[in-house]
Amino acid sequence: MNNYEGIFSKETMVLVRNRMTAFFYKHFCKPIFFRYDPENVHDYMTTVGRILGSNFLTKKLTRAFLGYTNPILEQDILGIHFKNPIGLAAGFDKDALLTDILPDVGFGFEEVGSITGEPCEGNSRPRLWRLPKSESLVVYYGLKNRGCVEISSRLRGGKFRFPIGISIAKTNCSATAEIDAGIADYFKAYDTFVGIGDYYTINISCPNAFGGEPFNDKEKLEKLLSKLETIPADKPVFLKISPDLSERELDDVLEVVSRHNISGFVCANLTKKRGESGKIMDNDVPEKGGISGRAVEELSNKFIADIYKKTRGKYIIIGVGGIFTAEDAYKKIRLGASLLQLITEMVFKGPQVISEIHQGLVILLRRDGFKNISEAIGVDNRFS
């Protein structure tokens, strides 16, 4: 009887299910998807996700094929309960259309957007490219979204089954390139979303917007955060930073943030670097756009470690970039990340990768004697 219990245990069944799904994605779905323009595939999968999230039966079936939970992964952070540590990063669900299905896919939370003060069509196409050898994407969307008014009206009063983060950025247009106008745009979007979602992220690091990334400058960042703080904060606020900051620029950001009501950091956004990381294996790489996936992994890990150590663990860190396996995720956690986000990994590995990573994390945590994931945060990066 015990042998049968082992064969048919929940963990074994999930492992077998994930391997079957991964095989099917690798040999059937991925070859088809990779024949088509990646933005068209993204839009198609968004439509599929909306359909799957539209009724109880399809949500239940999705959960049966992709879901995974384990108490060892649950955390309460900043008054928010997270069933799983991996969330969907901003940039995929730009208009918050997938909130009904993502919990069943296995995500512990999601960050919608980035959302701007005005509707934005983004940059001209093509604006998304795959780098298969590098397991990376080149992204040049330019903050495409339907704007804060439309998206907030749809989300307001909604009952969500997992935490929702609202990523705020400035509209990608020439008008917001002027600092005061850019701040006013952030302010409009931030103010519009008061009372909606569980946390906010101020995205100051989009590499594809008109005017660049002016708020990496400490005087301009000070001005932005001071203006936003005139709105009474009813939720935790994170700052999403670039992985391309110099150490001095990072120190400047930390200095400014220390004077404001910021709860943590999202580390990190897309990198503009092409060959410096040594992770770009593809020959034909577009010059425009930022890069996600493996190419940003080491940069992200360095920022997680630096921020955790420099601030003595004061801030909650959400780690993003190059999380393809449980070992990748575990490394970020042990360096100081409390939560994680991904997008690119689903493109190359399939949707079951979320469950694979979560199940693998449980194995790694138990191997090292941890009773909860929170005990592993920063253990490889202790400050004196």
Language-model-detected regions and their locations in the chain:
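Glycine-rich phosphate-binding active-site loops on the catalytic face of alpha/beta enzymes
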Residues: G108-C120, G264-K272, G322-I323, A329-E356
